[in-house]
Every structure is written in C-alpha cells, then in structure tokens.
Amino acid sequence: MTADNAIFIPPYKADDQDVVVELNNRFGAEAFVAQETRTGMPVLWVKRAQLKEVLSFLRGVAKPYSMLYDLHGVDERLRTQRRGLPAADFSVFYHLLSIERNSDVMIKVSLSEGDLNLPTVTGIWPNANWYEREVWDMFGIDFAGHPHLSRIMMPPTWEGHPLRKDYPARATEFDPYSLTLAKQQLEEESARFNPEAWGMKRQGANEDYMFLNLGPNHPSAHGAFRIVLQLDGEEIVDCVPDIGYHHRGAEKMAERQSWHSFIPYTDRIDYLGGVMNNLPYVLAVEKLAGIKVPQKVDVIRIMLAEFFRITSHLLFLGTYIQDVGAMTPVFFTFTDRQRAYTVIEAITGFRLHPAWYRIGGVAHDLPRGWDKLVKDFVEWLPKRLDEYTKAALQNSILKGRTIGVAAYNTKEALEWGTTGAGLRATGCNFDLRKARPYSGYENFEFEVPLAHNGDAYDRCMVRVEEMRQSIRIIDQCLRNMPEGPYKADHPLTTPPPKERTLQHIETLITHFLQVSWGPVMPANESFQMIEATKGINSYYLTSDGGTMSYRTRIRTPSYPHLQQIPSVIKGSMVADLIAYLGSIDFVMADVDR
C-alpha cells in the first residue's frame, strides 16, 4: 500500500493565521473577537447573525474546511475568568478542520439564557446533525431548521439538560430512584420506533416495508447499540442508528474530579485503548500548565500507546473475521493479545486500564528486564500477522463478503467527520503522527498504510498494516530509549517526585495538596488531538483557574463513524451491514462517553 498524493497535505503550522486574514478581508476585522488560547488554532467569536455566513464561507473557501471536526457547547454562567470575551450565558463552538491546509479554526458564538437559538448547519456539514442534537440534549440550545432535534444521549423521557452548571452532578442530589410499573411501561413505550417521526413510509408503491430492530443487544452491534432498519425483503431502504445506551456522563464527571484524579476515567472512553486514552488528556493539561516533559517520558508514552494500538487492532481483526462467519481466528487473536498484555502488565502493573500516564510524566520508571519482554514480542508478532494474512485475509469467502461492500470516498469521509483507518482506506494520507507530530513522533521512522477503495476489506487491511508499523515504532523505542527522569521537574507535575518529600517540607506540602485537592491550573483553554486506535481522539479543556476543569469536551472518533452508517449502507443487504459494522471498529463507550 502506497501513499496517494491526490491531496497534498502541507507541514503543520500551529496557530495558522492565514484563515484569519481571509476572514478579515471578507467580513472585516470588526466582525470577530479573537481569543488567546493554548489550543494551537485561531479562536474567533462571531455574532449569531453572521454565524452561518461565516461558516459557509469557510466551507467554500479555496482549500476548504471540509470537516466539521467538532461542535458543542459551554455553560458560561459560572465562569469567572472571561476578560476580553463577549458576554455570554452559554456559548457554542464550531471546530473546523482543513486537510488541504493541515490547519484548524474554531468559531464561537455567544448566547443569552433567554434566547438559546441558533440556525442549523446540517446543510453545510451533514455530520452536524448528531452534534446539534447532543448540544440540545446536554444544554437545551435549539437549532432552527434541524431535521430531527431530539434526545440522543439521554432517554426520550429525560427531564433537564445534564451539562448545565445548575444540573446536579451527584446521585445524592436527586430524590431516591424508584421504578414503578407505570414508569417502566412508559419507558418501554418511549423506545417504540415511529417511522413517520423520521420521515419514513410504511409502504412503497408495491410493497410493505418491515422495520427491524438490530440491537441494542445483538452480538454484531458490538455493544449496547440499536439500529432500526427499514427493509424491503433483505434490502436496506433506510436505517436509524440509536445510541446513548452506554452514556456515563464522562464530561460531567470531569467537572467534579481534580485534573489528576480524572486520569482513570479517560481509560474508560475507548476501553480497548488503555493508556492511549490518557495521552491527549495529559498533553492538553500539560499545555495549560506549561510543562515540557523529558524525552524519556515521550518515548515511554509512545511505546505503550503503540502496544495498545496493537491490542485494539488484534481484537478488531478477530471479531471482524468472526462477523463475516469465520470462528477460529478470534480465539487466536485473543490469545495473541494476552502476550501483549503480559508486557504491558510488567511495565505498568495493570492490563486493560492502567491509568498510567501522569501530568508531567508517567507513574514510575521502566522496570528491570522490560527490554527483553519487548524484544521478544517485537520479534514474534510479525510472523503471526503473516499467518493471519495468509490463512484468513486472503480467504475467498471473506473477500467476497467485504470487497466492494460499504464503500465511500475521501470527500464523503471528510463530510461525515471520518478519521483514522476509515479515512486512510479511501487513499487520504492523513495520520496525525505524521501530519501533526506530537510527543516526538517526528523522530520515528514508519509508514502510513493506505488503501484506495474505501470498502470494508480495505479498512481491515489498513489496520493490519498499522500493526506492522506499530511494531517498527516499538522496536525503535526499544533500541533508543533515552536515559533520564520519568517525570518533569515542574511545580505542577502531579504527583511531584516523592524522593524529595522526606527532605523538603515545602515539597511534602505540595505533594499532599496536589494529590488531595489537585493541582491548580492557570485559567486558559487548551486542546490536544492524537491518532488513537479508532481515529482522532481529542480533549478540549477549559480551566477557570481551579483544581478542576470548568469544561472538558471529549471528541471521540467512533461517534461520527456511526452517524455515517445510513449514508453508506442504504441499498445494501442486511448481511452487508454486519460486515460494515465490523469494519468500522468501534466500542460504544467511545461513542457514548
């Protein structure tokens, strides 16, 4: 698989001001209020009356912002550090990404509590649909013209908007819960699918359509996930994905945990990603704190992150092949994952959820003998991947079930916010480790695997090749592990190095305060995205100068990937949907947070 040069991706330039010049030339500098942040991109506030015009301009400009990367809200009412910003009770931000520019821009709009209305942008970016629904669900902000503004994370019967600051964050602040028979029947009835509410017909010209629930408890749904299918025989006429069954309020939890104590919660976002989940969070916090970690920390973090990329991809490979009917490989891939977890456990002390990265470093140094364990694994895995390729991936039945199935092109992928292997399988050479290196990835030699058909088979093959590249990266970590400390010498490193606590009373006090109350981060905003196991994962943090986050926005790759399903699978067979779901590689914790 070789690189596709159809889209040239220039070197990354943080805080790229070119778009600001273009916007000022088009609308005038007075139309915007620039906000200084540590997000690495221009952040501009606009008036609501000009919002849609500005966004349309960015979508159609030369080298356009083809991807609506994220869209969400903030309850600004309790925020104290807002000097220089427009008055706002609530705000909504639009994070736009341009592949052709390799740069981002964030547009914000302020709203007053008595007038929480915005125009929908679903006509500009189709993936705005779910994001706008979630903003309404969590904050109660209306989007005029939205095709189906309804609950998406919370049940249809839910009352209130959970991410508002006046909404309780603890169960003890609610009345005791009781489930009466009448309430149970109400909840069950609320889940009944109404085709007319979604613009679907019950009959065609010569046929009656059948409506089938796939999930929320179905092995091929890969979690608590429901898709309602409109069927003409075996053909999918239309479908409606239904998410939220796995929602745990991760972003709300972040407002009640210290910067340090939230780290274990990040492990549970993509629960197969392990420390890969910690990485964007601690990098974003380190931007707030102004911490520069030692080189050894970067290399250790990369090595462990790539181990979890391999374990996640091995699980994907086994279940993907199983979804299309082959039973044996999944037992082998799970056994192979155990060998990786043996190494991970020896280094971190844990297996699936180590919560091992720290603000300013990692939990502890590499143990004695780590290098032999890593070396043995690096030498062993490539031969296993060769066996999988020969025995399973070249199988004619698997190819027949997946080649040409659920295919989409680069343009469609960008419009729906698709990242990771799903984007690179269309030939788009965009991998953050190369395009926007972080944690020292620019010092490693590896290739970005690509395919060109964008179908279910290509998505699988890209991930298999990614495992080979992860082995290359881990091998370079093994051969070039620097000497030095495993934590940064910085006042906000948490926990601080403990060796000095027995010698300096000030260090002991700092250690106690940072572990109990948590470190105090400067008031600002920061942002970090990484190339995670399932696509681009990012944390957008807002600090109000306290020990806890004022607002934590977690953007996960699986969320837009599931929203894309209807546009890809219409007109296909039910069996093709099963292959498509397997090829996406998602877990519902990553979708629902």
UniProtKB/Swiss-Prot annotation:
Region named NADH dehydrogenase I subunit C: 1-184
GO terms for MF: NAD binding; NADH dehydrogenase (ubiquinone) activity; NADH:ubiquinone reductase (non-electrogenic) activity; quinone binding
Keyword flag Translocase: yes
Superkingdom of the source species: Bacteria
Region NADH dehydrogenase I subunit D, annotated ranges: 208-593
Alphabetized SUPFAM superfamilies for the sequence: HydB/Nqo4-like, Nqo5-like
Enzyme class: translocase
Keywords from the named record: Cell inner membrane, Cell membrane, Membrane, Multifunctional enzyme, NAD, Quinone, Translocase, Transport, Ubiquinone
Main location: membrane
Catalysed reactions, as listed in the record: a quinone + NADH + 5 H(+)(in) = a quinol + NAD(+) + 4 H(+)(out)
Cellular component GO terms held in the UniProt record: NADH dehydrogenase complex; plasma membrane
InterPro entries associated with the record: NADH_DH_suC, NADH_DH_suCD, NADH_Q_OxRdtase_suD, NADH_quin_OxRdtase_su_C/D-like, NADH_UbQ_OxRdtase_30kDa_su, NADH_UbQ_OxRdtase_49kDa_CS, NDH1_su_D/H, NiFe-Hase_large
Location in or out of the cell: Cell inner membrane
Membrane topology according to the record: Peripheral membrane protein
Pfam families cross-referenced by the UniProt entry: Complex1_30kDa, Complex1_49kDa
EC number(s) reported in the record: 7.1.1.-
Function as written in the Swiss-Prot or TrEMBL entry: NDH-1 shuttles electrons from NADH, via FMN and iron-sulfur (Fe-S) centers, to quinones in the respiratory chain. The immediate electron acceptor for the enzyme in this species is believed to be ubiquinone. Couples the redox reaction to proton translocation (for every two electrons transferred, four hydrogen ions are translocated across the cytoplasmic membrane), and thus conserves the redox energy in a proton gradient.
Oligomeric and partner information: NDH-1 is composed of 13 different subunits. Subunits NuoB, CD, E, F, and G constitute the peripheral sector of the complex.
Family recorded in the similarity comment: In the N-terminal section; belongs to the complex I 30 kDa subunit family.
Protein name: NADH-quinone oxidoreductase subunit C/D
Organism, scientific name: Pseudomonas putida (strain ATCC 700007 / DSM 6899 / JCM 31910 / BCRC 17059 / LMG 24140 / F1)
Lineage: Bacteria, Pseudomonadati, Pseudomonadota, Gammaproteobacteria, Pseudomonadales
